Amino acid sequence: MACYIVPYYHHPVLSHPNREIFSHRHHHHHRFCNNLLNRRISVPRSSAISDGGVSYNTLVSEAVRLLVPQANFDSSKLKVEFLGELLENKSNGGIITPRTYILSHCDFTANLTLTISNVINLDQLEGWYKKDDVVAEWKKVNDELRLHIHCCVSGMSLLQDVAAELRYHIFSKELPLVLKAVVHGDSVMFRENPELMDAYVWVYFHSSTPKYNRIECWGPLKDAAKGKQQGNHQGFLSSTTSRKLIRHKSIFHTLFTFLL
């Protein structure tokens, strides 16, 4: 598993946003909104990463392995909802970008809900960090499609900060189930575009703790969904490097910055 650690960044334009720009009902806001969403953050290249490593509490990792049961994907417990343009044409698997996913779960029933859309609204994103939802989006980088996964490890509450390492390991353990839910729930698109199973999965762990505020490459989707991970490569990004990376932002990064 290739691993890259990045700090949070703040864009001056997005520091004090007007939340109304996400309402497509107002034409004069629509153009400004599109300009923001077209800004994308580049994935760091290995040449931009200095050598380094991350040390973890092996007791926490082992506790998660032993005490947190491995969740097996059960398609009968998955509910799929299509929103936006995809609501009118669910069978159209050709719309790959923009295409986003939000996977939510119920702790009591173990039921899953996968929302598939071409946009992410603020109400959905608030649920991302309040209910431990997982957000994903397809993104084209250098003519290659990649699936970007976003998990909120800590930063939204004191309890999350205290349990940052525990939450990181739990998210890591549950990610194969998340990927299986995406593949099953959006089966029409994957059936029409089988090459997407070879697309690389990039996982963004968002945290106020620098150690867990990181990006990890989990390899091809077909392997990541099975929990198979490749060789480990780690490194730290310097603050200078991170500033250079603030060139383009994904839909998710733009919306997330609006909540900060």
Swiss-Prot record:
An example Gene Ontology molecular-function term: lyase activity
GO biological process terms, semicolon-separated: chlorophyll catabolic process; chloroplast organization
Compartment(s): Plastid, Chloroplast thylakoid
Catalysed reaction equations from the record: chlorophyllide a + 2 H(+) = pheophorbide a + Mg(2+)
Pfam families assigned: Staygreen
Known EC number: 4.99.1.10
Record keyword Plastid present: yes
Primary localization: plastid
Tissues where this protein is expressed: Expressed in cotyledons, pollen and young leaves.
NADP in keyword set: no
Organism domain of life: Eukaryota
Annotated transmembrane regions: none
Transit peptide location on this chain: 1-45
Keywords: Chlorophyll catabolism, Chloroplast, Lyase, Plastid, Stress response, Thylakoid, Transit peptide
Entry's Gene Ontology cellular component terms: chloroplast thylakoid
Induction and repression of expression: Down-regulated during natural and dark-induced leaf senescence.
Function, as annotated: Magnesium chelatase involved in chlorophyll a degradation in the chlorophyll-protein complexes of photosystem I (PSI) and photosystem II (PSII). Contributes to the degradation of PSI and PSII in the thylakoid membranes. Recombinant SGRL possesses high dechelating activity against chlorophyllide a, very low activity against chlorophyll a, and no activity against chlorophyll b. Contributes to abiotic stress-induced chlorophyll degradation and leaf yellowing during vegetative plant growth.
Family under the similarity heading: Belongs to the staygreen family.
Binding partners and assembly: Interacts with the light harvesting complex II (LHCII). Interacts with the chlorophyll catabolic enzymes (CCEs) NYC1, NOL, PAO and RCCR.
Stated name of the protein: Magnesium dechelatase SGRL, chloroplastic
Source organism phylogeny: Eukaryota, Viridiplantae, Streptophyta, Embryophyta, Tracheophyta
Gene: SGRL
